[in-house]
């Protein structure tokens, strides 16, 4: 069984929205109380409380506070589990010598939502093509909320968990489905072998010279973003107008995110449908987008320029594109080969003679000093990773096996159903 997440937009009425808001407030209160309990226990008696210590106290909490009963035991346990995971991540970073980031108290307006970690306490019903209903709770206190969205996995998909989130005044429900391999299989319409070099000048360059333009969603919205932030800076902090402009800034960030995901979903889907082999190189965007500020003793150089470059790297969504290619390739029976960048050096290696030709980042044309081969820098890199994909025993990623459906019918064509209300995934 495979797992796939589908997101629905919720349309609760005023009473349901007020009730959901109160539930988020209670989950936030539980999270903060559990965090305070852990801190106090360590400060007073030197004891570190575990998840199970706090989970065992839930019956007493529900007996003293009746409003916690309707939230459901499993949802309350998941909130405590979130705090436990935050502490595990904190101790892991301390051990690794990284910036620790101690878990912090959360304001209810910034608490994103809550989760039902199993199918108990809620139900999803698909009504027609794009309409759905999500029922939360049981008995006479249960509430039904209209939702918009659909999935392409059919009636055989079994709901696994539900996450309710509030974002910029809107409500969403993310449902994890357990589906069979046949249900999530994608039809592949081509058998091309393509090398891809992801970048910033062009979002993608292929070994045959074709390119995909970089949409630059953040850069296109920067004038509007700067204008809103200037207006907000002139308002009194905490005032109605200050908050109103803050919501507009958040909406603009959300719009940029939606445009980016839409572009990535459509582009990666089109790519895995047309290719039997996709070759690319390993990208570590976290390292690529590190700050150049430095320290007080060793201040960084060209900090503003590096900040602008980091913004462009993150705006391109290259890491998200790799993730989408990985799971969609499994569904379509496409092999994705990820070359080891440090060993292969695709931007410095000649695709014709395989010799290393050092170049600076400003040199956009590859001219080999050994064999005279000339090509665009990104096209040459794409050709190098494609050759590497055809070399046995190379690459850093496991090669996914085709699903049963693709082994038998790799060229069948079926109509794709959008995985969510907003994009075709």
What are these regions (language model features)?
Residues 52-167, 294, 311, 315:
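Acidic carboxylate diad motif detector
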């Amino acid at each position: 069984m495979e797992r796939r997440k589908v997101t629905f937009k919720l349309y609760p009425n005023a009473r349901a929205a007020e009730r959901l808001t109160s539930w988020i407030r209670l989950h936030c209160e539980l999270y903060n109380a559990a965090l305070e309990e852990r801190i106090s226990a360590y400060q007073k008696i030197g004891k570190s409380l575990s998840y199970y210590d706090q989970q065992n106290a839930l019956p007493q909490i529900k007996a003293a506070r009746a409003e916690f009963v309707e939230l459901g035991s499993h949802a309350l346990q998941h909130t405590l589990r979130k705090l436990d995971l935050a502490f595990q991540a904190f101790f892991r970073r301390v051990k690794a010598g990284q910036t620790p980031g101690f878990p912090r108290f959360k304001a209810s307006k910034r608490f994103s939502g809550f989760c039902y970690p199993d199918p108990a306490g809620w139900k999803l019903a698909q009504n027609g093509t794009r309409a759905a209903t999500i029922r939360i709770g049981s008995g006479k206190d249960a509430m039904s909320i209209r939702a918009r969205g659909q999935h392409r996995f059919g009636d055989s998909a079994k709901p696994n968990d539900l996450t309710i989130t509030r974002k910029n005044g809107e409500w969403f429900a993310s449902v994890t489905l357990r589906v069979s391999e046949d249900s999530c299989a994608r039809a592949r319409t081509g058998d091309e072998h393509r090398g891809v070099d992801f970048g910033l000048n062009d979002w993608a360059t292929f070994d045959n010279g074709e390119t995909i333009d970089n949409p630059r969603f953040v850069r296109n919205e920067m004038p509007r973003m700067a204008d809103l932030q200037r207006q907000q800076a002139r308002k009194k902090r905490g005032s109605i107008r200050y908050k109103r402009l803050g919501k507009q800034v958040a909406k603009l960030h959300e719009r940029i995110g939606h445009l980016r995901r839409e572009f990535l979903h459509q582009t990666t889907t089109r790519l895995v449908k047309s290719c039997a082999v996709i070759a690319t190189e390993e990208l570590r965007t976290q390292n690529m987008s590190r700050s150049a500020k430095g320290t007080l003793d060793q201040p960084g150089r060209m900090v503003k320029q590096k900040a602008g470059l980091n913004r462009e790297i993150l705006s391109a969504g290259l890491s998200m594109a790799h993730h989408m290619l990985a799971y969609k390739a499994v569904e379509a029976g496409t092999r994705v080969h990820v070359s080891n960048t440090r060993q292969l050096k695709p931007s410095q290696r000649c695709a014709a003679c395989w010799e290393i030709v050092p170049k600076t980042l400003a040199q956009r044309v590859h001219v080999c000093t050994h064999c005279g081969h000339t090509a665009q820098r990104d096209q040459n890199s794409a050709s190098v990773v494609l050759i590497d994909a055809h070399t046995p025993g190379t690459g850093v990623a496991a090669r996914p096996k085709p699903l049963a459906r693709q082994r038998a019918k790799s060229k069948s064509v079926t109509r794709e159903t959008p995985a969510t209300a907003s994009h075709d995934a």
